[in-house]
Amino acid sequence: MLPIRECVSQTPGYVPGEQPQTTDYIKLNTNENPYPPPDKIFEGLQQELTKVRLYPDPVSTQLRKAAANVFGISYQNILAGNGSDDILNIAVRTFVNPGEVVAFLDLTYSLYETIARVHGASIVQIPTNNQFELNGPIICPEAKLIFVASPNPPVGKHLNRDYLEETCKQATGVVLIDEAYVDFSDENHLDFLEKYDNVIISRTMSKSYSLAGMRVGFGVSSTEIIEQMDKVRDSYNLDRIAQTLGTAVLNYQDYFKGVWQQVRHTRTRLIESLRTLEFLVFDSDSNFVLASPQWIAASDLYTQLKERKVLVRYFSHPRIKDYVRISIGTDQEIDRLLEAIHEIKGSN
């Protein structure tokens, strides 16, 4: 028998969204940015390709400096990761011994639980109300690490800011605020770093910066926390190409601010259209919406959309089994989605 750790063998693996092998799908299932980055970011790529026999910068210096300019902090307060999932892993490995507690909401990004369990942590799930919101601050004094996403998937709304701040104030361990979707809203929590020395902000370039295929993310915190997390980081955790493109993309803030505004405009149109089509739809601060059709089972809608080459995300979790999650695409992609829904609704 293989000597597999019990905490691994008993942990269900993370289930990613479907990645079709053909290009004839309208892909609204994995919250990717529908708009590509500017062509100019690729201009320096050929020179970097000639250096692939050499290791990349082990600490991603230029990338961190570019991020520091955007975040308005020192690059020494930033750790670069192979996507923000890397930052989540590093945080558990840095702060949580086997058997110690990791806390997170009962409905949130499912990778938190997977990461915590495979590291042998104990789990505390914080209950949310019937609107999938916090009932108050997270009070969990035994938690060495609290994961909290704002905006919080799969609903996509920001959590109550006062509750989050009180969570940071009350926590005896570290609070990691996952801001994967924050650029599609008007609010962030970087100011918490000035008030609390136990806070980490994680960011990704997969959603707002159109680099999901490159895997670039950041952890932002005090220099003390960053120094400790850096000890745990895998050596050369970002390849040369990811560092180059990530650095280049961050220099195009005006372009991406326009993209984010377009996504928000399309999001508003989609929410209004779905409500007209008899969906219950949550307001969203993200690049996706969570919607429940009132005239068909959500699982059947998912299947019938897929038959029409439109992919959305369906979760079998009991609390959201009546919902589908729809990523915000281009206006043309959303038109195709709505046409397909009209067709399905007309046949039911």
Swiss-Prot record:
Q: What is its EC number?
A: 2.6.1.9
Q: Which reaction does it catalyse?
A: L-histidinol phosphate + 2-oxoglutarate = 3-(imidazol-4-yl)-2-oxopropyl phosphate + L-glutamate
**Top-level enzyme category:** transferase
Q: Which residues carry this modification: N6-(pyridoxal phosphate)lysine?
A: 207
The cofactors it requires, by name, are: pyridoxal 5'-phosphate
* Sorted UniProt keywords: Amino-acid biosynthesis, Aminotransferase, Histidine biosynthesis, Pyridoxal phosphate, Transferase
Q: Name one GO biological process term.
A: L-histidine biosynthetic process
InterPro entries, A to Z: Aminotrans_II_pyridoxalP_BS, Aminotransferase_I/II_large, HisP_aminotrans, PyrdxlP-dep_Trfase, PyrdxlP-dep_Trfase_major, PyrdxlP-dep_Trfase_small
Query: Which pathway does the database say it acts in?
Result: Amino-acid biosynthesis; L-histidine biosynthesis; L-histidine from 5-phospho-alpha-D-ribose 1-diphosphate: step 7/9
What PANTHER family is this protein classified in?
A: HISTIDINOL-PHOSPHATE AMINOTRANSFERASE, HISTIDINOL-PHOSPHATE AMINOTRANSFERASE-RELATED
The UniProt family comment states: Belongs to the class-II pyridoxal-phosphate-dependent aminotransferase family. Histidinol-phosphate aminotransferase subfamily.
Tell me what this protein is called: Histidinol-phosphate aminotransferase
The organism named in the record is Rippkaea orientalis (strain PCC 8801 / RF-1)
